[in-house]
Amino acid sequence: MKSIIVPVDFSNQSEKALKVAASLAKEQNAELFVLHMLELSPAIMGESGYISQEQVVHLIKLGEKRFSDFLDKPYLKDITVTPVIKHYKVFSEVAEVAEKHKADLIVMGSNGADGLQEIFIGSNTERVVRTSDVPVLVIKGNEVDNFNPKNFVFASDFEEESVPALKKAKKMAELLGSKLHLVYINTPGDEFMSTNDAYAKISKFLDEANVGMEVEIFNDYTVEKGVINFSKKIGADLIGIPTHGRRGLSHFFMGS
C-alpha cells in the first residue's frame, strides 16, 4: 500500500477516519493525501454579484487556514501528509483524486445509523463508492486508537461481476493481517436458494476467481440483518461489501 486518500470536513467522524488512515499509513509506510472539499456556492463564487472577488479570496484563505490547523495533529507526525483542496463539493472528485495519486485505499467517516442501509444508500459515502474503483474503508462508531482488524467479513451475492471485489478484499485482508470470512446471505422469498444450488453457484464463482476459500451460507430474514448477525457471530471488526458499477450498493439490499 503506497497511498491513502481521506476526505475530511472537520467533523468528529472525519477525524476518526483520519486517525485510522494515519495508523494505516504509518504501518504500511504509505503517503496520506488528506482531501477537503471547500464548498463555495455560485453566490460566493461571485457569479451573481453578491460578493466581491476579494471577499471570495478571503473566504478561501480562511478555509485553507482551518484545514491547515485541522492537520496539526500529533498522530500525523512522521507520516508523509499531502493536503489537497477542491473548491466544489462534487463527490466524484474523490475518485478522481484517488486515481490521480494512484491511491490504494479511500478512508471515510460515516454518521450513518446502526443499519447498513442507513450508512450507505443515498449517502455521500455511496456517492464515493459508486464512482470509485479503489476500495473504500468506512469508519463509524467509537474512536479507533489502533486499527487492527482481526476478522474481516466479505458478504457477496457471488455473481461473476463481484470477482474483482473479492480479489481486492483478499489483498486487503493480507495487508491488514486479518482473517477473511466469506459469507452468502440466504433469505426467504424469490431470492431463496437451496443449499445445493447455493454451493453450486459459489463453487463456480470461486473457480472463476481462482480462490480456494470456504464460504458460509447464513440464513436470515434480510440481507442486511444477515450481514450484521453473521458479523456479530464471528466477532468481525470489518465488513466488506462489493458494489456493482453504477448501481452502487442498492442492489445488495433490494428486498431487505
Predicted region positions:
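Small/aliphatic-rich secondary-structure junction motif
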Residues: 1-51, 150-216, 236
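Structural beta-alpha unit
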Residues: 13, 72-106, 207-253
